[in-house]
């Protein structure tokens, strides 16, 4: 059995993950709370701290990406690859009203044709591992 630490925005920051890893090294993967994929490729201060390799040392950390734009997803995934990540996670589960009303997270599930095109594009254009929540 594999044990994964789920991402919870505002809870499982790098500080929480690091403390948990140091006290209980029982997780196979530590998912980082979502990063909003943007055209400008600039990570926020919180996002930079969360994805910093120094803040995730020793653990298999997986950044989560929130978007419904395939090109933004691919740009963000490529930038995360430069940080040394081998895998990213697509957030299709966030039920937050502010996320869903923008058609992201669980809101993307209401657009099956658009989602299928999105998934076809991202899986065909990157060699990174992609998991979906």
Give the positions of each predicted feature.
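Short, well-ordered coil/turn segments that N-cap beta-strands
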Residues: 1-3, 26-28, 54-61, 84-88, ...
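Alpha/beta catalytic cores of nucleotide-metabolism and tRNA/nucleoside-modifying enzymes
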Residues: 3-4, 9, 14-15, 117-121, ...
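Glycine-rich, positively charged N-terminal anion/phosphate-binding segment
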Residues: 8-79
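Alpha-helical structural signal in soluble globular domains
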Residues: 23, 79, 83, 121-126
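Non-cysteine beta-strand/loop elements that form the S-adenosyl-L-methionine
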Residues: 32, 86-95
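Glycine-rich, proline-tolerant flexible connector loops at the mouths of alpha/beta enzymes
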Residues: 36-41, 92-112
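Alpha-helix-loop-beta-strand connector modules within alpha/beta enzyme cores
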Residues: 51-62, 106-132
């Amino acid at each position: 059995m594999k044990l994964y630490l789920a991402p919870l925005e505002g809870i499982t920051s790098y500080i929480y993950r690091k403390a948990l890893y140091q006290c209980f090294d029982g997780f196979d993967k530590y998912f980082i709370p979502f990063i909003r994929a943007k055209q400008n490729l600039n990570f926020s201060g919180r996002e930079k701290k969360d994805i910093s390799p120094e803040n995730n040392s020793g653990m298999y950390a997986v950044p989560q990406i929130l978007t419904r734009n395939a090109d933004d997803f691919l740009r963000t995934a490529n930038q995360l690859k430069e940080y040394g990540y081998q895998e990213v996670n697509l957030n299709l589960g966030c039920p937050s009203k502010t996320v869903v009303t923008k058609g992201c997270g669980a809101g993307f599930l209401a657009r099956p044709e658009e989602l299928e095109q999105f998934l076809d594009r991202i899986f065909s254009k990157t060699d990174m591992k992609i998991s979906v929540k």
